[in-house]
A protein has these predicted regions:
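Sec-dependent N-terminal signal peptides
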Residues: 13-23
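C-terminal motif of bacterial Sec signal peptides marking the signal peptidase cleavage site
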Residues: 25-28
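Primarily extracytoplasmic ectodomains and periplasmic/lumenal surface modules that are beta-strand-rich
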Residues: 99-101, 171-172
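Mixed-charge, low-complexity intrinsically disordered segments
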Residues: 100-156
């Protein structure tokens, strides 16, 4: 895939995380800070408990979520403080500790290259259907992530950052947060797959 397509896929995946349980729109209420805190907790727990499986999303997102599912069991978070900056802006300060799975992409690349070499050496290489390719890709990515998660030298990141909510027409919307997206995808960089 081209780098631009990978970036588009990453944006789709990240937007799915943000929109999984319609967190982008929260009905205005008496205690907006508490509602926003609870909704953020619900989004994280929904993702950690596999709720994304019931969402409609593209194949790349489905493969990614299925592969990184085990990582959510090793993730922890704490909402430190919620501040109402003004009547239209609330800031949630959160700390998320998550496994660094960035090395899983290199493992995944190697698995793909090994499969390619195996097919090239085969006297009768098999042409796979799209469904077979998706299944194989999912398997390789899941194996790569699990290999990284089971590594005794697995590193963790612990990041503290703000998530901003802005009120539009009496509804609260979570603003894009690259730090939140990085944590929820465990520092995976799919655009690195096309490099080298």
């Amino acid at each position: 895939m081209k780098k631009e397509e990978e970036e588009i896929n990453m944006k789709k995946i990240l937007s799915i995380i943000v929109g999984l349980i319609l967190i982008s729109t929260i009905t205005s209420c008496q205690n907006d800070k508490k509602i926003i805190e609870n909704d953020l907790k619900n989004l994280i727990e929904f993702t950690r408990n596999g709720g994304y499986k019931s969402s409609n999303h593209d194949k790349m997102a489905a493969i990614t979520f299925e592969a990184i599912d085990e990582g959510y069991k090793k993730m922890s978070y704490k909402i430190n403080k919620t501040t109402e900056e003004n009547k239209n802006k609330i800031i949630v300060n959160i700390t998320i500790k998550y496994p660094d799975l960035s090395g899983a992409i290199e493992i995944f690349k190697n698995k793909i290259l090994e499969e390619r070499q195996r097919l090239l050496k085969s006297p009768n290489p098999t042409v796979r259907s799209d469904d077979e390719m998706i299944k194989l890709t999912t398997q390789f990515l899941k194996e790569s992530v699990n290999e990284k998660l089971n590594d005794p030298n697995l590193r963790y990141f612990e990041d503290t950052f703000d998530i901003v909510y802005v009120k539009h027409n009496d509804n609260w919307e979570m603003q894009d947060s690259p730090q939140f997206n990085k944590a929820m995808l465990f520092n995976l960089h799919f655009n690195s797959f096309t490099q080298n």
